[in-house]
Amino acid sequence: MNLKPLADRVIVKPAPAEEKTKGGLYIPDTGKEKPQYGEVVAVGAGKVADSGQLLEMQVAVGNKVLYGKYSGTEVAVEGEDYLIMRESDIFAILD
């Protein structure tokens, strides 16, 4: 299935949660922190300004991004988990 976000929305594939600590201990599902970074898999066309001008997106497919802990809406498509969020919910692009 091909996902195409609308307007200034971005679809992000979150990074997998850590399975074990640096010391080698396994983390149970209830103790795992949700990752706050992931890879952009789709972007919308951009936001329309009050003047009617289309503002281009600053993120692109393939960018690794950092976002807030509670950013976006979680969705599952064909067994894969994604986050749909506005571009303004993204804090930074990781190099």
From Swiss-Prot:
Pfam families: Cpn10
One of the record's GO molecular function terms: protein folding chaperone
Gene3D superfamilies membership: GroES chaperonin
Alphabetical list of SUPFAM superfamilies matching this protein: GroES-like
GO biological process: chaperone cofactor-dependent protein refolding
PROSITE patterns recorded: CHAPERONINS_CPN10
Subcellular location: Cytoplasm
Alphabetized InterPro entries for the sequence: Chaperonin_GroES (IPR020818), Chaperonin_GroES_sf (IPR037124), Chaprnonin_Cpn10_CS (IPR018369), GroES-like_sf (IPR011032)
Keyword Cell inner membrane: no
Gene Ontology cellular-component terms listed: cytoplasm
Sorted UniProt keywords: Chaperone, Cytoplasm
Known function: Together with the chaperonin GroEL, plays an essential role in assisting protein folding. The GroEL-GroES system forms a nano-cage that allows encapsulation of the non-native substrate proteins and provides a physical environment optimized to promote and accelerate protein folding. GroES binds to the apical surface of the GroEL ring, thereby capping the opening of the GroEL channel.
Subunit relationships: Heptamer of 7 subunits arranged in a ring. Interacts with the chaperonin GroEL.
HAMAP family associated with the record: CH10 (MF_00580)
Protein family per UniProt: Belongs to the GroES chaperonin family.
Protein name per its UniProtKB record: Co-chaperonin GroES
Organism this protein belongs to: Chlorobium phaeobacteroides (strain BS1)
Gene that produces this protein: groES
